[in-house]
Amino acid sequence: MRAKGTRKNYQHLWRWGTMLLGMLMICSAAEQLWVTVYYGVPVWKEATTTLFCASDAKAYDTEVHNVWATHACVPTDPNPQEVVLQNVTENFNMWKNNTVEQMHEDIISLWDQSLKPCVKSTPLCVTLNCTDLTNATYANGSSEERGEIRNCSFNVTTIIRNKIQKEYALFYRLDIVPIDKDNTSYTLINCNTSVITQACPKVSFEPIPIHYCAPAGFAILKCNDKKFNGTGPCTNVSTVQCTHGIKPVVSTQLLLNGSLAEGEVVIRSENFTNNAKTIIVQLNKSVEINCTRPNNNTKKGIAIGPGRTLYAREKIIGDIRQAHCNISKAKWNDTLKQIVTKLKEQFRNKTIVFNQSSGGDPEIVMHSFNCGGEFFYCKTTQLFNSTWLFNSTWNDTERSDNNETIIIPCRIKQIINSGRK
């Protein structure tokens, strides 16, 4: 979507302008179409303007998206208007779009505000003496589960600043990094690079649709071509005052709760021949993924300074079971088949290989997302582990009955990098 504005014309055209304005008013009355006119000369041009947001946020709801939208957005238009532009062709570029950039800025603002009630854990950047959690029963005894949660002791400054007190708490393995070779001394991750914040599991976190609207004198151009690839000319164009509702879901690898394509699966990239560019796949059918963290934790408050309390895990009740996500193998394989069909239209006579990430930050290597205020990091090796030959046959490295469910192991991250002071 792009914003278009009307441009002022200061030339002395008032005589012809008055006549033209009268003609436009007659046409408008006949067809119920309106256009902003300055001195009788309607001129459209591409414009960069500040959009504003609209939402149906509930002021009484303490969920962080509702709290942010209540203060930052206006109520939605109960009767939105869309005008189809006949015989109009416009060029669009989804990869260089001012609307998207403003959305990103708003998401950053939303997350900053959402993390403000959370405790800054930077004062906890001390040496942690950690051991594997003992006296715990593991559900299946896998090595992935063992060592996932560690029991750590550390010294913290109490409310009285010159007093030191020894405390202990349970930390996820993703939240700590070793500082010696014997794997007993640790520190919180990202302590030496930026401000870190404790995630807030108690905070309600459920994205709501956000609409972006153009101010008076501007309109948003919308491309309605169902197979539009993201760049180039679009022949089915309309104008709207606001976009559709967009849920600001933040995730990596898999896009959650996105919009579905009407018709076939659509793949988009800024440049398919450049392997450094991202390829976005828009599915035509949703694939359900159910995620859970089955552990039952008890928490305790640890004073880490005046007015600051860190809520840490004290113990785990019952079995230690790994967080995981479930997805239907049949639906996933059918989705991959449709994606491969579209990829082969771009890469002819090529073998398509779905493989896991070769390395990098946890957010890149794993499927990361926020669920109920907790940050999940899930291994997608089982999802991206197949080879599709150029003659339309495929070879799954782990063939099995398609009626089964793929169980994706996940890890929880409690300490997050807030990135700014």
Swiss-Prot record:
Record keyword Protease present: no
Signal peptide boundaries: 1-31
InterPro entries the record matches: Gp120_core_sf (IPR036377), HIV1_Gp120 (IPR000777)
Keywords from the named record: AIDS, Clathrin-mediated endocytosis of virus by host, Disulfide bond, Fusion of virus membrane with host endosomal membrane, Fusion of virus membrane with host membrane, Glycoprotein, Host-virus interaction, Membrane, Signal, Viral attachment to host cell, Viral penetration into host cytoplasm, Virion, Virus endocytosis by host, Virus entry into host cell
Disulphide bond pairs: 53-73, 118-200, 125-191, 130-152, 213-242, 223-234, 291-325, 378-410
Region V1: start-end pairs: 130-151
Start and end residues of each stretch annotated as V4: 378-410
Keyword Cytoplasm: no
GO cellular component: membrane; viral envelope; virion membrane
Region feature (V2): 152-191
Any one biological process term the GO annotation gives: clathrin-dependent endocytosis of virus by host cell
Start and end residues of each stretch annotated as CD4-binding loop: 357-367
Source superkingdom: Viruses
Pfam families on file: GP120 (PF00516)
Coiled-coil ranges (or none): none
Subcellular location: Virion membrane
Residues bearing carbohydrate: 87, 97, 129, 135, 140, 151, 155, 183, 192, 229, 236, 257, 271, 284, 290, 296, 326, 333, 349, 355, 385, 391, 395, 403
V3: annotated span: 291-324
Additional comment: HIV-1 lineages are divided in three main groups, M (for Major), O (for Outlier), and N (for New, or Non-M, Non-O). The vast majority of strains found worldwide belong to the group M. Group O seems to be endemic to and largely confined to Cameroon and neighboring countries in West Central Africa, where these viruses represent a small minority of HIV-1 strains. The group N is represented by a limited number of isolates from Cameroonian persons. The group M is further subdivided in 9 clades or subtypes (A to D, F to H, J and K).
Protein name, entry field: Truncated surface protein
Native organism: Human immunodeficiency virus type 1 group M subtype B (isolate NY5) (HIV-1)
Higher taxonomy: Viruses, Riboviria, Pararnavirae, Artverviricota, Revtraviricetes
